């Protein structure tokens, strides 16, 4: 007998964030599956630059869940957390003797899903 619980999932997406998706995934792996309040505390004290952006998106997902779906923030947990690669900004660094070296500035799209 297969019983599936009807989960009302709410999500928030941050797009074109100027961080490498590889470095963002390092933080997302730490909070995936955790409770909403616990994840906020973890993000507050982790030393990575990505934490600031992920925390903002997580707070937005919590507000969306509370306002749009009437869910309680204290009972939320993170069901989805992933970072996709965005477009790469291409710049040039001037070098000696008229040369130019390419610089690639990666961007990413962060998606967080929460439910009760």
Curated annotation (Swiss-Prot):
Transmembrane parts of this sequence: none
Subcellular location: Plastid, Chloroplast
Family annotation (SUPFAM superfamilies): Ribosomal protein L22
One Gene Ontology term of the molecular function aspect: structural constituent of ribosome
Assembly and interaction partners: Part of the 50S ribosomal subunit.
Protein name, UniProt field: Large ribosomal subunit protein uL22c
GO cellular component: chloroplast; large ribosomal subunit
Organism listed in the record: Porphyra purpurea (Red seaweed)
One matching Pfam family: Ribosomal_L22
Role: This protein binds specifically to 23S rRNA.
Alphabetical keyword list: Chloroplast, Plastid, Ribonucleoprotein, Ribosomal protein, RNA-binding, rRNA-binding
InterPro entries: Ribosomal_uL22, Ribosomal_uL22_bac/chlpt-type, Ribosomal_uL22_bac/org-type, Ribosomal_uL22_CS, Ribosomal_uL22_sf
Biological processes per GO annotation: translation
Signal peptide annotation: none
Record keyword Ribonucleoprotein present: yes
